[in-house]
């Protein structure tokens, strides 16, 4: 009984990271089920919870409205229920990225257990090449080539890897600049996805408070108006796609879109990032 009480306390406790991961989880379910209202999702995920009392239907609508706003953390059993209906949804809420962003999580533990949960595409970049998997060793640092490879994956897995290496290199100013740039650019590309675009402001605020704030403010890549800067950069990036031939956009895969975005970002000059970088400006291409 005592252990059960402890577990309940942990489930109900939330912070800024929990709020965004739950809201993203809900959004993923919403898109996967093509549902508009919390009550619709409730009926599809928890049909057994629907009750008729005095002629009125109760369907846990309030609980799911709270999930929509990230106000409560769902129980693991409910996450499993949702996964059975919308495959991949549990990967969103339980992603390694959220643990990587929590400074209370031991870095050695992340290196031991977290990286192994990332996709093979990402792990292949992070580990030194070896004939025997049992002898795999992480690279000491991420070269420009590896940073670009991660950026062009533009996934939560790639972002998690970058955050972990950022935490590893907080004492190394030179590597922090490069990794910071890669995190910023990767997050920009990810936020172009429909399921993430509505959370772009929350994600950059979270990245600022949990990751970029680990270094001295003088060494941070973000200025005082970082939120507005990021949203403007995202708008510029989206505008470039709106100028493309609509027929090409329809036939493009996400991988192709990522490469186009990455190429565009590579051409853009940055300022005020260690006196070399700034906001993205399309007129500098």
Which positions does each model-derived feature cover?
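A short, Lys/Arg-rich alpha-helix, primarily the initiator
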Residues: 1-48
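Recognition helix of helix-turn-helix/homeodomain-like DNA-binding domains
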Residues: 46-80
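DNA major-groove recognition helix of helix-turn-helix/homeodomain DNA-binding modules
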Residues: 74-96
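Short, charged recognition helix plus adjacent turn
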Residues: 94-122
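Short juxta-domain linker segments that transition from a proline/glycine-rich
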Residues: 118, 123-137
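Extended amphipathic alpha-helical coiled-coil/heptad-repeat regions
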Residues: 131-285
């Amino acid at each position: 009984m005592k252990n059960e009480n402890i577990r309940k306390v942990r489930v109900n406790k939330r912070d800024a990271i929990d709020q965004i991961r739950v809201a993203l989880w809900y959004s993923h379910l919403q898109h996967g089920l093509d549902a508009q209202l919390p009550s619709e999702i409730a009926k599809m995920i928890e049909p057994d919870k629907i009750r008729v009392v005095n002629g009125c239907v109760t369907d846990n609508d309030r609980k799911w409205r709270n999930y929509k706003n990230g106000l409560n953390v769902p129980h693991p059993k409910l996450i499993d229920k949702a996964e059975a209906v919308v495959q991949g949804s549990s990967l969103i809420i339980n992603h390694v990225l959220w643990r990587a962003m929590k400074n209370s999580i031991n870095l050695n533990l992340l290196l031991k257990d977290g990286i192994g949960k990332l996709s093979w595409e990402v792990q292949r970049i992070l580990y030194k090449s070896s004939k025997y998997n049992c002898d795999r060793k992480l690279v000491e640092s991420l070269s420009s080539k590896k940073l670009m490879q991660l950026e062009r994956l533009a996934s939560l897995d790639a972002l998690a890897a970058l955050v972990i290496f950022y935490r590893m290199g907080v004492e190394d100013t030179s590597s922090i600049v490069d990794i910071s740039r890669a995190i910023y650019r990767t997050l920009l590309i990810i936020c172009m996805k429909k399921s993430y675009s509505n959370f772009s402001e929350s994600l950059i605020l979270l990245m600022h408070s949990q990751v970029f704030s680990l270094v001295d403010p003088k060494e941070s890549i973000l200025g005082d108006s970082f939120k507005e800067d990021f949203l403007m950069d995202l708008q510029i990036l989206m505008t470039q796609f709106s100028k493309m031939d609509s027929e090409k956009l329809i036939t493009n895969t996400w991988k192709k879109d990522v490469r186009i975005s990455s190429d565009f970002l590579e051409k853009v000059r940055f300022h005020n990032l260690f006196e070399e970088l700034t906001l993205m400006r399309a007129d500098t291409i």
